[in-house]
Amino acid sequence: MRSGPPVDEKGISCIVCAFNEADRIRNILDVIVGHPALSEIIVVNDGSTDATADLLCSYPELRVLSHTPNRGKTYALSRGVAAARCEHLMLLDADLSGVTAADIDALAAPVMRGEAEVSISLRSNSLWIYRRLGLDFVSGERLVPRDLLRGAVEAMERLPRWGGEVFMNELIIRRGMRIAVVKWPRVVNIRKFRKAGLWHGTLAELGMIADAVSVLTPLGVVRQHLALLRLVNRPSLRARVRGWAERALS
């Protein structure tokens, strides 16, 4: 692991988990490397078998953690969390397209200004229902306090490959943390069928759903989404959610 230079511990550690993203990861690295809002950038190379490792070597500013074999995003994220040195963590997927420096600022701003404790992105290609509700509860782009996850590293290591976001959501709900939803209208993530082909990509997408359900149960998924919506830092949305919940229970 490259340890990197000293950092402002009051700042933001950015964590990017990557598996075979050599064709895409430059899109995000070219935006975040040198970004003034980020004190350090940690990239976890999750057992990549393509040219990801070689590409990362061309960015000396990064702290790179590598392991083999591929263990899945949640395990990779746990390693990044354990290594982070700053009080806040910005979590970003490696396959984003359309991200700008302004998007990074927008994701950081609500938390760093004290308006919320957590911020979560809402991408332009989030599922229609998420965009309609105003919250993508499995978004991989977030800003959270480090202490939310630092004590949960061992638990994260035991989670399914894609169980990290819903696990994190439960921690947020237990603490009653205020959430800011940050719209990223020009940002998309690359769907797995485009990366791995229709068959393997579809299986991977189904695997992500199965992992979320295995952590929560189907009813738990609905409950969690409603609980998160109640924490969104917009009074009008909170009122709408209370109305939906009351009608659903009546």
Regions found by a protein language model. Give the residues of each.
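Hydrophobic helical membrane-anchoring modules
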Residues: 2-5, 173-250
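Cell-envelope/extracellular polymer assembly enzymes that use nucleotide-activated donors
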Residues: 11-13, 40, 167
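Conserved donor-nucleotide/metal-binding helix-loop-beta segment in metal-dependent transferases, i.e.
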Residues: 101-122
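Conserved donor nucleotide-binding strand/loop of the catalytic core
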Residues: 39, 53-83, 119-122
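Short aromatic/hydrophobic "clamp" motif used to bind/position activated sugar donors
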Residues: 89
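Short, well-formed alpha-helical segments that are part of the catalytic scaffolds
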Residues: 20-34
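A conserved acidic beta->alpha catalytic loop
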Residues: 45-53
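Conserved short acidic donor-positioning loop in nucleotide-sugar-dependent glycosyltransferases
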Residues: 32-33, 46-47, 71
